[in-house]
Amino acid sequence: MEKKDVFIFSISKLHYFDSLSSNMLYHKYANKIQQLQNNNTMENKISTILMQIENEGIGSFEEVLNNHKLANTMAVSVLVKDRDGKYALVLRTKNLAVGAGMLSVTVTGALDQNDYNCDNPVLACAKRELREELGIFYTICSQIEYIVISKSKLQPIFIINAEIADKWEDIICNFKNAKDYKNEVEEVLIVSLEDMKKLMQKYNMTDATFFHFQDVISRVE
């Protein structure tokens, strides 16, 4: 593309578990699925297979992103700061499929069918997740910085930094009224960059979240 700051990606409709099954089959894990039939729960099966994939390798970023045989659902990682430069981080509840009990950015989530009907599906997803998880209905600036792929999950994740015009202290009381707050959020932490560094040493997090934090910190050092 000759236009500056424009990129194109091809998309097609799929279901949530399509990505998991297609990636297993492509990487020849079908036999391992059969071996796990006696496990008690589907959760145990999936966890075991993901561990095997992580240990045995999944290929380079380019190999995963450019492989048209893989059904890679797209997601967003959104980190928001207020007008005082403070960031909202989230401790996730322990009942989530990804990132359970871990430290996270402000919101995360996968693009859904409604997002794809918007002019910019990625930013539409970011706005929806902010609204559903924390009741934040607007940002004054949202910037897509990178696309990353986790080592343990074949999912392209758009790294997004955003700002709001308010102070967190003025709106944090509204967070608990958000649609998905109870299911996804254990606690919201309002922190400076220095606090963020300390929390990175204290809590577990996904590698995508770690990358996002490190990138933001590196920009001011």
Which stretches of residues belong to each language-model region?
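N-terminal leader/linker segments that precede catalytic domains of diphosphate-processing enzymes
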Residues: 1-104, 110-128, 136-221
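Short alpha-helical functional segments enriched in proximate histidine and acidic residues
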Residues: 133
